[in-house]
Design a protein with these regions (language model features):
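Generic structural signal for hydrophobic core residues of well-folded globular domains
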Residues: 45, 58, 62, 77-78, ...
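Active-site recognition of the HExxH zinc-binding catalytic motif
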Residues: 52-71, 75-76
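Pan-zinc metallopeptidase signature
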Residues: 124-212
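Generic recognition of stable, solvent-exposed alpha-helical segments in well-folded globular domains
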Residues: 69, 90-93, 146, 170
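Secondary-structure capping and boundary motifs in well-ordered enzyme cores
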Residues: 46-50, 66, 87, 91
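Auxiliary, metal-adjacent structural segments of Zn-dependent hydrolase domains
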Residues: 1-37, 43, 47
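Active-site/pore-lining binding-face segments in mid-to-C-terminal subdomains
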Residues: 72-132
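Second-shell loop/turn segments in exported
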Residues: 40-44, 55-63, 84-85
Length: 212
């Protein structure tokens, strides 16, 4: 709320989904009940993704409907949270979404980029990457996941989100724009009035002149 007032609102706790095994078999990590406004997450999802998913479902609760928008809202909220676990989750998930998007248009570039990233990470981050991949690779082979994806995609499309499941990954466009505007451009900006020790309007040179 401090950085993004749009998030000011309900602070009701995010609940734990019951029947976790069923939701896990369908590849569902979180859910927002439209009729009650309750947000819940699947406790069996990878730990590293839970803070981000909590923020994602809370975004839905605040009527941020489209998945790409809810994902971006989750990134902003989690990355601004003073809790470092939320910050870590935000950037971890942003990385995963962007790498997945890159792999669809330039698979070898994605492989090369991931190799460079993973070569420099510590063992804890590498463990989270392995666990995250293992969770989703296992679920992809389950029939229930395919059915769940189809139902979810159809639901999103009938709700006005024409991209269906692809909407989740479209957050990459927003993430890249945010990085350019908030990180890249400010770092390239030239200081308007750089300090010049010989500029008489910035420094009193009287003492230097008299000392000659």
């Amino acid at each position: 709320e401090k950085h993004y007032p749009v998030f000011a609102g309900s602070t009701l706790p995010v609940k734990k989904l019951g029947w976790s095994n069923m939701y896990t078999s369908m590849g569902i990590t979180g859910f927002t009940f439209a009729l009650t406004g309750e947000a819940a997450v699947n406790p069996q999802a990878p730990d590293v993704s839970l803070p981000f998913t909590m923020c994602h479902e809370m975004a839905h609760r605040m009527c941020i409907a489209y998945e790409r928008d809810a994902n971006f809202a989750a990134f902003l909220a989690a990355s601004s949270n003073p809790d470092t676990q939320f910050q870590y989750s935000a950037y971890f998930m942003a990385y995963r979404y962007c790498m997945a998007a890159l792999s669809t248009v330039a698979s070898q570039s994605a492989v090369d980029a991931r190799a460079r990233v993973e070569a420099g990470v510590n063992d804890y981050l590498r463990y989270d990457m392995v666990q995250y991949d293992a969770f989703y690779q296992t679920r992809k082979r389950e029939t229930a996941t395919k059915v769940g994806d189809k139902v979810n995609s159809t639901y999103l499309q009938t709700s006005g989100d024409s991209s269906g499941l692809a909407s989740y990954g479209e957050v990459c466009d927003l993430l890249v724009s945010w990085h350019i505007q908030e990180i890249l451009l400010p770092s390239l900006a030239v200081e308007e009035n750089p300090f010049d020790p010989l500029d008489k309007t910035q420094v009193d040179l009287t003492g230097i002149v008299n000392a000659r």
